[in-house]
Amino acid sequence: MKTVTVKDLVIGAGAPKIIVSLMAKDIARVKSEALAYREADFDILEWRVDHFADLSNVESVMAAAKILRETMPEKPLLFTFRSAKEGGEQAISTEAYIALNRAAIDSGLVDMIDLELFTGDDQVKETVAYAHAHDVKVVMSNHDFHKTPEAEEIIARLRKMQSFDADIPKIALMPQSTSDVLTLLTATLEMQEQYADRPIITMSMAKTGVISRLAGEVFGSAATFGAVKKASAPGQISVNDLRTVLTILHQA
């Protein structure tokens, strides 16, 4: 299993890493939330850019990114515009989505970008290559806030991300039952044991899926999302509680 190192953080070794999402809508809130987040116990800062109101002004977006970089210089920064179709706050064209991610890559301010698998194969491949040429890692993602597909389909999506040279494939699915959570965990384990040559991130959402956010080290998920303040997805738990449980499982 190949690990991914961002700054001094080795993803894919040891206990799952904790990612927190910052979802401020303007520069003033980016600044105040960044200061509040600075004291929290987490590993990776995800900036959910789809919550930022002034998206059309690239300078404003990058000014906000600069604040995050300067406030928490030691934390890996993951730049994420979550599309409306995958649970995000805003809908933008594919062209605008790619341009925004390329601007983030060009800025030199971000360590990783999130790229949605179903953006379009050619655009995804080109953007991965562009990111890698600028030493930016790619978390390739897929989210379904309605259902959990069969294990074979989950594995197929993760393998497709891997074939597109994602540094970290990621999938988040909504369970309709406890057995859906088992499906996600089964797929994670099979992917990790049989196909993955890099870290993967998987989760089953909502209260039903909470176990998947805690048991990554057992089944093969390299990171998990926690909440500093407001959860960015159903089922997230506080970073302090999360770290406690991850440490217990790691040391057992």
Curated annotation (Swiss-Prot):
CDD domains: DHQase_I. This is 3-dehydroquinate dehydratase. Its EC number is 4.2.1.10. GO terms for molecular function: 3-dehydroquinate dehydratase activity. One of its GO terms (biological process) is amino acid biosynthetic process. It comes from Shigella sonnei (strain Ss046). It catalyses: 3-dehydroquinate = 3-dehydroshikimate + H2O. The lineage of its organism: Bacteria, Pseudomonadati, Pseudomonadota, Gammaproteobacteria, Enterobacterales. It comes from the Bacteria. HAMAP family: AroD (MF_00214). InterPro entries: 3-dehydroquinate_DH_AS, Aldolase_TIM, DHquinase_I, Type-I_3-dehydroquinase. Belongs to the type-I 3-dehydroquinase family. Pathway: Metabolic intermediate biosynthesis; chorismate biosynthesis; chorismate from D-erythrose 4-phosphate and phosphoenolpyruvate: step 3/7. It is an enzyme of class 4 (lyase). 3-dehydroquinate binds at S21, E46, W47, R48, R82, R213, S232, Q236. Involved in the third step of the chorismate pathway, which leads to the biosynthesis of aromatic amino acids. Catalyzes the cis-dehydration of 3-dehydroquinate (DHQ) and introduces the first double bond of the aromatic ring to yield 3-dehydroshikimate. The active site is at H143 (proton donor/acceptor), K170 (schiff-base intermediate with substrate). Keywords: Amino-acid biosynthesis, Aromatic amino acid biosynthesis, Lyase, Schiff base. Homodimer.
